[in-house]
Amino acid sequence: MTIIDSQVHAYEANTPKRPWHNVPNWPDHVTGDEMVAAMDKVGVDGAIFISAFGLYRYDASYAVQVQRAHPDRFAIVKPVDPDDSAVGDVIADWKRTPGAVGIRIMLTKEPGRDRDPTDPGLDRIARAAVKHDLPVNMLCWGNLDAGTALIDRHPDTH
């Protein structure tokens, strides 16, 4: 039986080359190679690699780099920015990225990150996801109602 981990994050150490947005209470690094070694150790065949928003925000370049190094092990998901008026183009470009299998919306209820569930940027994302046949992964800690409202408005979104 093939075993796929439905969500992993891998990341490089915080360096000027690829600086972190925040410094969480995580290990200093869990690189793509280290993730593959850990997966091998426990018998995981593949994983959905979600670019770590807390570290890299909307820059999924590290996820792309890791997927290219391990194309048979990782599929990738990119957080997208509801405030970007060109988010539809971002999603179209992402769809053409080898290994891309979805996009992510951050809908947590945290200071400075609250988002109104009727935000037009969320609607742009949902419409583009349907158009480009990309599933939407939502993080909605403490804000499940916002996620439900978005789903209700866009029932064709996966």
Residue ranges, per PLM feature:
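Conserved, mostly hydrophobic/aromatic
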Residues: 7, 39, 63-66, 94, ...
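Catalytic pocket-lining loop regions of alpha/beta-barrel enzymes
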Residues: 115-158
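Acidic-and-aromatic substrate-binding clefts and catalytic sites of carbohydrate-active enzymes
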Residues: 51-58, 80-88, 111-117, 140-145
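Hydrophobic faces of well-ordered beta-strands that scaffold small-molecule active sites
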Residues: 4-8, 46-51, 75-78, 101-105, ...
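Glycine-rich phosphate-binding "P-loop"
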Residues: 19-29, 101-117
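Metal-cofactor-binding active-site regions of metalloenzymes
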Residues: 44-51, 58, 65-83
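An N-terminally biased module of ancient metal coordination in phosphate/nucleic-acid-related enzymes
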Residues: 1-58
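Short, acidic/polar
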Residues: 28-39, 84-96
